[in-house]
Amino acid sequence: MASATPAMSENAVLRHKAASTTGIDYESSAAVSPAESPRTSASSTSLSSLSSLDANEKKDEYAGLLDTYGNAFTPPDFSIKDIRAAIPKHCYERSTIKSYAYVLRDLLCLSTTFYLFHNFVTPENIPSNPLRFVLWSIYTVLQGLFATGLWVIGHECGHCAFSPSPFISDLTGWVIHSALLVPYFSWKFSHSAHHKGIGNMERDMVFLPRTREQQATRLGRAVEELGDLCEETPIYTALHLVGKQLIGWPSYLMTNATGHNFHERQREGRGKGKKNGFGGGVNHFDPRSPIFEARQAKYIVLSDIGLGLAIAALVYLGNRFGWANMAVWYFLPYLWVNHWLVAITFLQHTDPTLPHYNREEWNFVRGGACTIDRDLGFIGRHLFHGIADTHVVHHYVSRIPFYNADEASEAIKPIMGKHYRSDTAHGPVGFLHALWKTARWCQWVEPSADAQGAGKGILFYRNRNKLGTKPISMKTQ
């Protein structure tokens, strides 16, 4: 990203303005009268008028749409062809050698940190127990950062952005993700489904927001009451955030939490009688899960084998060196990895400016614009390989390797115009603040109060905390 978006008030939309990429003067072109046009026939004029009427009708169809900040919204009107054409060809090039260099760098960071702490942060060198506790706590944070970077490399493998060779990508990703207790192929397939259905209320596979009806059911309230409930207490918000950061990732793998729950529609019939939740038959470990197709079953088994080998290795190390040591060496850093994965993914897809679409109004281009870039400073750029900084372009062209994503991201901004979203204020501190802000602002989605026709199929975040655009009042309905 070339530059951070200037800090603005909380009610402002963080957007990049459209920039013209051609030398055409659209204003002077439009000012040419039919008589001066090279095509002066009646049919030409009539077609022009019809086109203008269609455009006006289309515009009116989406009038009255407001995001959570109260900004007017219209759906994207560019095409995926426009996006792909704007990206320089060399951005698509993948280098196996360069990718492995980053793997080695991350492994070196992990091993060097372990060596230094294991050999120097000892009772002999540091007699103070409190000081050793603080230093080993720092160790868990550092290892969590480095391991998250390695996890991101595995994510690259899942998109075949690691190498032109699918075999090399999958083998590398399987090893990396298995070591981090991630079922590689299982997650690869569900993540692919997420990319294909991003922003679709019936297809998206991750951080799909609740509808007003679902939120009311969760709270045990009538739908009409939701907008008039008292404000959620900050302590409740904080506890919810802590719980999500601790167990959000394993909960997603085991129950498909935050994914869609329309499994009855699985085309092979694998979703009949299955639903999200513990014991519901929807998870990332069972080859029969409706998340997958029958042809993918053998890869789910391979993912489970990878997890089995990793768990066996951890059990051996725990018995060999002690479980207290393993808690510090592996399991606490693992919790930090969980935290970063959930935080990054949540904030990539949740923001007061972002819409969601019903099935009838969704398409791939609109879905790709349901994402936002975030700035994590040095940590995001270098340790996390830019996964939060260039997520928008990643959703349009996922095979672009992360080391080319900055240039590709800059290339598509003029095409996306106002539909490109970024929140880059205050770096890592701003990122963590965004966790709190989105939890308070983004609680469910519903249509805009003044939406008409097709516009009712475009949903925006609302909340009970009296923040931003008010929810629809149903008292008189």
Swiss-Prot record:
Listed EC numbers: 1.14.-.-
Keywords carried by this UniProt record: Endoplasmic reticulum, Fatty acid biosynthesis, Fatty acid metabolism, Lipid biosynthesis, Lipid metabolism, Membrane, Microsome, Monooxygenase, Oxidoreductase, Transmembrane, Transmembrane helix
Motif (Histidine box-1): 155-159
Keyword ATP-binding among UniProt keywords: no
Metabolic or biological pathway: Lipid metabolism; monounsaturated fatty acid biosynthesis
Uses in industry and biotechnology: Mediates gamma(3) desaturated fatty acids (e.g. densipolic acid) and ricinoleic acid accumulation when expressed in S.pombe with a temperature-dependent toxicity, at 30 degrees Celsius but not at 37 degrees Celsius. Triggers hydroxy fatty acids accumulation in seeds when expressed in A.thaliana under the guidance of a seed-specific promoter.
Gene Ontology CC, one term: membrane
Membrane topology: Multi-pass membrane protein
InterPro entries (alphabetical): FA_desaturase_dom, FAS_N, Fatty_acid_desaturase
Top-level taxon of the source organism: Eukaryota
Biased composition (Low complexity): 27-48
Keyword field contains Oxidoreductase: yes
Catalyzed chemical reaction(s): (9Z)-octadecenoate + AH2 + O2 = (12R)-hydroxy-(9Z)-octadecenoate + A + H2O
Top class in the EC scheme: oxidoreductase
Membrane spanning residue stretches: 101-118, 133-153, 167-187, 234-254, 299-319, 327-347
Residue ranges of the region described as Disordered: 26-48
Purpose: Oleate hydroxylase involved in the biosynthesis of ricinoleate (12-hydroxy-cis-9-octadecenoate), that is present at high levels in C.purpurea sclerotium tissue. Exhibits delta(12) hydroxylase activity on 16C and 18C monounsaturated fatty acids (i.e. oleic and palmitoleic acids), and, to a lower extent, gamma(3) hydroxylase activity on ricinoleate.
Family: Belongs to the fatty acid desaturase type 1 family.
UniProt note: domains: The histidine box domains may contain the active site and/or be involved in metal ion binding.
Protein name in the entry: Oleate hydroxylase FAH12
Native species: Claviceps purpurea
Gene name of the encoded protein: FAH12
